[in-house]
Amino acid sequence: MSIEGVFREGFVTTSLDAVINWTRTGSLWPMTFGLACCAVEMIHAGCSRYDLDRFGVVFRPSPRQSDLMIVAGTLCNKMAPALRKVYDQMAEPRWVISMGSCANGGGYYHYSYSVVRGCDRIVPVDVYVPGCPPTAEALLYGIIQLQNKIKRTNTIAR
């Protein structure tokens, strides 16, 4: 079988997709976008009790170094352009986790004039973590769900 036949059958690209997705799931570098009390639980998940490092999750200070944004807390109208600007500065491929009721849909402040009713109106969201505030276990579960989503994507054969 020639090399064209191998590519036509999809074996090489499928195997390469599996390797690339495996490396991406083991090296998620989130940038913290803590806006309210959910950020405390996000910090709690990064401490020694839950240890996000064992999943390959290392917090980065710059959007240019990160591939995951965790939006944690109430997003107000004034902060929405900054969220979009930081999202646009992130390198491809990039993912977003919306953490908490306020980031998911406005939460307790849903009817306030100054609150965005969900960060998915500003940036595309991959995983929603419910709760007010969500526990560190819920954030860990959301990260595991994102890793499973990344494993299912095809990066080469589109």
Curated annotation (Swiss-Prot):
Signal peptide positions (record): none
The protein's required cofactors: [4Fe-4S] cluster
GO terms for cellular component: plasma membrane; respiratory chain complex I
Source organism of this protein record: Azoarcus sp. (strain BH72)
HAMAP family xref list: NDH1_NuoB (MF_01356)
UniProt keyword 4Fe-4S present: yes
Annotated family: Belongs to the complex I 20 kDa subunit family.
Keywords: 4Fe-4S, Cell inner membrane, Cell membrane, Iron, Iron-sulfur, Membrane, Metal-binding, NAD, Quinone, Translocase, Transport, Ubiquinone
GO molecular function: 4 iron, 4 sulfur cluster binding; iron ion binding; NADH dehydrogenase (ubiquinone) activity; NADH:ubiquinone reductase (non-electrogenic) activity; quinone binding
UniProt gene name: nuoB1
EC class name: translocase
Identification of the protein by name: NADH-quinone oxidoreductase subunit B 1
UniProt xrefs under InterPro entries: NADH_UbQ_OxRdtase-like_20kDa, NADH_UQ_OxRdtase_20Kd_su
